[in-house]
Amino acid sequence: MARPHIEPFCDRDEHFKPMRLLGFGTGMHYKMLSMDTDTGACSMTVQFDGGYKRTPGFSWSEYEFIVIEGELKVGDRTCRTGHYFYVPAGYALPEISSDQGCLVLYMYNTGEPSHEEATEHHPSAQTQLYHDVDSYMDIPWAAGNVAKPSVASGCMIKLLNYNPNSFAMTFLYCMTPNFYQDIISYHDCAEESYHLWGTSWMMQFGYVPTGGYFWRP
């Protein structure tokens, strides 16, 4: 079945489990946020231990990740809190490592987590779709009214990715102080949210703290 409705949920209430899938090495731990039991697609918060290394390679699933805390080295670059990556299926990343350890949000969108050791992209990879950005420093906040009808004023977004295959969008959002919206809304697509920082209040579900998550089919 597809991913079930998950709400309310806070990953701070769960313990990390060791990642034991082939190719990911040792020193990677995860908290499962949601999973499609048919395809293996899932979202996880991941803790890399200090000294963690993963060989160059690609995944059979497209995936996205953003650094929540600490520093992650991708090849010879050091990526800090807020750095976001969209990685198409078959796109080979260089070695990743973390000297001091870091916390990362991972979203495998089309299949289960996998790592195929390689220094070249798969021939079918849509390499032109790959991108990464320091979302905290290099993208300005914009009004959240990307669709009509829209959210109330005071909800701001930073668009991180638009997927031309699925039309899915990934963005950061923030609620400014005293933001308030008292209407119930729904979407014609699945909706997923993870609280990187701060606390909000979600109607019948109450307060959602840092680490709060939902998946709405």
Language model regions located:
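Ligand-binding loop in jelly-roll beta-barrel domains
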Residues: M28, T78-C79, A89-A118, C189, ...
